[in-house]
Amino acid sequence: MARYDNIPEFETDLDGRGLRVGIVMSRFNQDVCEGLLSACTAELLRLNVSPELMRIATVPGALEIPLALQTMARSGRFDALIALGAVIRGETYHFELVSNETGSGINRVGLDTGMPIANGVLTTEDDDQALARMQEKGADCARTAIEMAKLLKQLQ
């Protein structure tokens, strides 16, 4: 039963059995991205997502993630998508541009297609921050993707 003034609440669990999950991962800052991927896929497996129902596409950098997500979302082959990448501040304005455009693009794809997308693109000041956050963020994206896929199915 709901926790909110006796109003019925949509309830989901984190059992990913039968869900088809697509992952788009940037190859830029590869060590961090592969750490995100490792944590993400380990959590997907823990949540009963079959390896046969997971697919990964790699792209050169963070700015290419939204287009790959959009194509996957429109394919009808996935129940949820996950974006993985790392944008680490340098000495130029490029960090803000890449961070803002990537985040905006990921959100736009989700809203335009109705596809749940977990955003696991880290934006950090330095490599140490990215390395410190990659495990938890990767696992969190897996949980978010499963929860939102199941919630959206209930809402329809």
UniProtKB/Swiss-Prot annotation:
Root EC class: transferase
The entry's keywords: Riboflavin biosynthesis, Transferase
Annotated metabolic or biological route of this protein: Cofactor biosynthesis; riboflavin biosynthesis; riboflavin from 2-hydroxy-3-oxobutyl phosphate and 5-amino-6-(D-ribitylamino)uracil: step 1/2
Catalytic reactions on record: (2S)-2-hydroxy-3-oxobutyl phosphate + 5-amino-6-(D-ribitylamino)uracil = 6,7-dimethyl-8-(1-D-ribityl)lumazine + phosphate + 2 H2O + H(+)
GO molecular function, one term: 6,7-dimethyl-8-ribityllumazine synthase activity
Pfam families: DMRL_synthase (PF00885)
Family matches, as SUPFAM superfamilies: Lumazine synthase
Binding site residues for (2S)-2-hydroxy-3-oxobutyl phosphate: 91-92, 133
Coiled coil: none
UniProt binding sites for 5-amino-6-(D-ribitylamino)uracil: 28, 62-64, 86-88, 119
InterPro entries in the record: LS, LS/RS, LS/RS_sf
Active site per database record: 94 (proton donor)
Protein's UniProt keywords contain Thylakoid: no
Biological-process GO terms, alphabetical: riboflavin biosynthetic process
GO cellular component term of the entry, any: cytosol
Record EC number: 2.5.1.78
Known function: Catalyzes the formation of 6,7-dimethyl-8-ribityllumazine by condensation of 5-amino-6-(D-ribitylamino)uracil with 3,4-dihydroxy-2-butanone 4-phosphate. This is the penultimate step in the biosynthesis of riboflavin.
Family: Belongs to the DMRL synthase family.
Name of the featured protein: 6,7-dimethyl-8-ribityllumazine synthase
Gene: ribH
